[in-house]
C-alpha cells in the first residue's frame, strides 16, 4: 500500500516540499537561513497576535498599553521583548540570506529572486509601521521624517503625505492605520513566502559550486531537516539571550519617552537594520535625489541578474569577485555605522564616499570583475 503522505492531496504538497524534496548534497550552512526566516515569521506572527490582544491603537493610550503589557500581562514583557528582538533576528537572517544569494549566484533563478526582493521590501514596510506603534518619541519622529520623504514626489507629493497621515500631521488616524497595516502585512508576507517556495521548487536549490546539482541529490528529510533544526536551536538561543538579558540593546532610549510633537529628539534615526539605507538617503543633499538613492539601494537587487557577466554562476572559484563582495559587505557595515551618527563632518563625507562605492561596486566593478575572470580563464596557447 502506498504511503498516505504520497497520495493524500494536501500531504503530497507537504511531502514534495519538505520530506522527499530532492536537495543538492553539498549545500552549506548558508542555505539554513530560508528555514530560519520561516521560523522568524512564525515567531513574529504568534508573539504579535498576543501583543495585539492587549494593545490599543490610540494616541492617548498606545504608550500606556505597551507599558501595561510589560507590567501586568502574564509574560507580557517576554512576548514584547521576543517580538522586538525577533525583528532584529529577522533582518539579520534576511541580510545573510540575500548575501548568500549574491555570493553564490542564486539571483539567476529570476522568479525566485524577484519575489524575494519584493518580500524584502514588504518586510521592511512591516517593520517600519510596527516601529511606530509603541508611540514613543522615536516612533513618532521616525514616522514623521520617513513619511515626509514622499513629499519629494513631484506634483502629488504633499497630497500623498496628507493622505497617508489621514490629516495634517502624524496623529491618531496615522497610528490606527499603521496598526491595521502592521496586522495584515505579515499574512501577505506568508502568502508571498509560499509563492517564493513555489518558484524555488520549480528549479530546485542552487549549491555552493554553482554547477548543475542534478547528478547528486539527496532527500530533504532527514538530512536537511536535522540540519535546519540545529540552525533553529542556535537562532532561538541567540534570540532568547537577547530578549532576556539585554532586551533594549538594539532599541533607542528615546522610545522610553512618550511621543511629544512639540519636542524633537536631537538625533532622529531608525532601527539598526535600516541605517545603511538611511545613510545613503542622508548622503545626498537634494530631497528627491535622496529618496531615489534610498529606493535604488534596495531595488538595485532586481538588476543583479542583468549585471552577471561571468561564465561561472557562483563566486566560489572567482577570487576577484570574492574580494569585491567582501568590500561590499564592509561598505554596508560602514554605512550602518554612519546612519547612526549625527549629521556633521567627518561622518557626512564618509557616508557620501561609502554611498558612491556601494553603487560603484555593484554596477561597475562586479560586472568588470566577471568579464576579467572570464578572460583569465581562457586558454592561451603560444
Curated annotation (Swiss-Prot):
Q: Which residues bind heme b b566?
A: 97, 196
Which keywords label this protein?
A: Electron transport, Heme, Iron, Membrane, Metal-binding, Mitochondrion, Mitochondrion inner membrane, Respiratory chain, Transmembrane, Transmembrane helix, Transport, Ubiquinone
Coiled-coil residues are none
Residues that bind a ubiquinone: 201
- What does the UniProt entry say about where the protein is found? Mitochondrion inner membrane
How this chain sits in the membrane, per its record, is: Multi-pass membrane protein
> Could you give a GO molecular-function term held by this entry?
ubiquinol-cytochrome-c reductase activity
- Summarize the protein's role: Component of the ubiquinol-cytochrome c reductase complex (complex III or cytochrome b-c1 complex) that is part of the mitochondrial respiratory chain. The b-c1 complex mediates electron transfer from ubiquinol to cytochrome c. Contributes to the generation of a proton gradient across the mitochondrial membrane that is then used for ATP synthesis.
Subunit structure, as described in the record: The cytochrome bc1 complex contains 11 subunits: 3 respiratory subunits (MT-CYB, CYC1 and UQCRFS1), 2 core proteins (UQCRC1 and UQCRC2) and 6 low-molecular weight proteins (UQCRH/QCR6, UQCRB/QCR7, UQCRQ/QCR8, UQCR10/QCR9, UQCR11/QCR10 and a cleavage product of UQCRFS1). This cytochrome bc1 complex then forms a dimer.
Annotated family: Belongs to the cytochrome b family.
Kindly provide the name given to this protein in its UniProt entry: Cytochrome b
Provenance organism: Didelphis marsupialis (Southern opossum)
The record lists the lineage as:
Eukaryota, Metazoa, Chordata, Craniata, Vertebrata
Amino acid at each position: 500500500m502506498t504511503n498516505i503522505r504520497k497520495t493524500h492531496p494536501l500531504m503530497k504538497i507537504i511531502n514534495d516540499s519538505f520530506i522527499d524534496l530532492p536537495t543538492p548534497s553539498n549545500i552549506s550552512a548558508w542555505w539554513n537561513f530560508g528555514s530560519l526566516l520561516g521560523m522568524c515569521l512564525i515567531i513574529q506572527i504568534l508573539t504579535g497576535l498576543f501583543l495585539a490582544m492587549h494593545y490599543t491603537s490610540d494616541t492617548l493610550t498606545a504608550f500606556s498599553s505597551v507599558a501595561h503589557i510589560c507590567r501586568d500581562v502574564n509574560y507580557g514583557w517576554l512576548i514584547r521583548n521576543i517580538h522586538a528582538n525577533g525583528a532584529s533576528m529577522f533582518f539579520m537572517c534576511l541580510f545573510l540570506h540575500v548575501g548568500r544569494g549574491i555570493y553564490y549566484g542564486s539571483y539567476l533563478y529570476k522568479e525566485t529572486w524577484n519575489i524575494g526582493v519584493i518580500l524584502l521590501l514588504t518586510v521592511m514596510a512591516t517593520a517600519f509601521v510596527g516601529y511606530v506603534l509603541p508611540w514613543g518619541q522615536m516612533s513618532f519622529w521616525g514616522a514623521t521624517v520617513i513619511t515626509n520623504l514622499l513629499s519629494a514626489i513631484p506634483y502629488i507629493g504633499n497630497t500623498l503625505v496628507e493622505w497617508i497621515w489621514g490629516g495634517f500631521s502624524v496623529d491618531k488616524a496615522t497610528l490606527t492605520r499603521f496598526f491595521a497595516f502592521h496586522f495584515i502585512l505579515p499574512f501577505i508576507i506568508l502568502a508571498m513566502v509560499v509563492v517564493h517556495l513555489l518558484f524555488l521548487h520549480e528549479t530546485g536549490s542552487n549549491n555552493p559550486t554553482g554547477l548543475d546539482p542534478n547528478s547528486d541529490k539527496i532527500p530533504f528529510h532527514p538530512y536537511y531537516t536535522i540540519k535546519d533544526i540545529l540552525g533553529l536551536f542556535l537562532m532561538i538561543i541567540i534570540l532568547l539571550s537577547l530578549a532576556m538579558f539585554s532586551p533594549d540593546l538594539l532599541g533607542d532610549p528615546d522610545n522610553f519617552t512618550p511621543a511629544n510633537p512639540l519636542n524633537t529628539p536631537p538625533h532622529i534615526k531608525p532601527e539598526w537594520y535600516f541605517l545603511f539605507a538611511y545613510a545613503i538617503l542622508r548622503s545626498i543633499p537634494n530631497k528627491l535625489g535622496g529618496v531615489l538613492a534610498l529606493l535604488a539601494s534596495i531595488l538595485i537587487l532586481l538588476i543583479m541578474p542583468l549585471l552577471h557577466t561571468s561564465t561561472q554562476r557562483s563566486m566560489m572559484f572567482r577570487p576577484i569577485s570574492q574580494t569585491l563582495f567582501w568590500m561590499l559587505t564592509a561598505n554596508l557595515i560602514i554605512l550602518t555605522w554612519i546612519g547612526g551618527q549625527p549629521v556633521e563632518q567627518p561622518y557626512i563625507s564618509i557616508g557620501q564616499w561609502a554611498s558612491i562605492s556601494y553603487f560603484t561596486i555593484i554596477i561597475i566593478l562586479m560586472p568588470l570583475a566577471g568579464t576579467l575572470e572570464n578572460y583569465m580563464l581562457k586558454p592561451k596557447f603560444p
